[in-house]
């Protein structure tokens, strides 16, 4: 399993505005699995990145909302 950081907007019908970007952390096998897990939400997904090593540790230490959802 890997942890993915998902950058998204709350409404997929609106134009993306950088200042409104939100993030969520999801644990899954692949990016595709994470996308399937989130498909029923009304999110406009901008970008998904896999967190590993030092990057993952940094997010754990410095993110005020590091709560991981499980995509399974």
From Swiss-Prot:
Organism domain of life: Bacteria
GO cellular component terms, A-Z: DNA-directed RNA polymerase complex
Gene Ontology MF terms: DNA binding; DNA-directed RNA polymerase activity
Catalytic reaction annotation: RNA(n) + a ribonucleoside 5'-triphosphate = RNA(n+1) + diphosphate
EC number annotated for this UniProt entry: 2.7.7.6
Gene Ontology terms: biological process: DNA-templated transcription
EC top class named in words: transferase
UniProt keyword list: DNA-directed RNA polymerase, Nucleotidyltransferase, Transcription, Transferase
Subunit-level organization: RNAP is composed of a core of 2 alpha, a beta and a beta' subunit. The core is associated with a delta subunit, and at least one of epsilon or omega. When a sigma factor is associated with the core the holoenzyme is formed, which can initiate transcription.
HAMAP family with a match to the protein in the record: RNApol_bact_RpoY (MF_01553)
The protein's role, per its UniProt record: A non-essential component of RNA polymerase (RNAP).
Family: Belongs to the RNA polymerase subunit epsilon family.
Protein's UniProt name: DNA-directed RNA polymerase subunit epsilon
Species this chain originates from: Staphylococcus epidermidis (strain ATCC 35984 / DSM 28319 / BCRC 17069 / CCUG 31568 / BM 3577 / RP62A)
Gene it is expressed from: rpoY
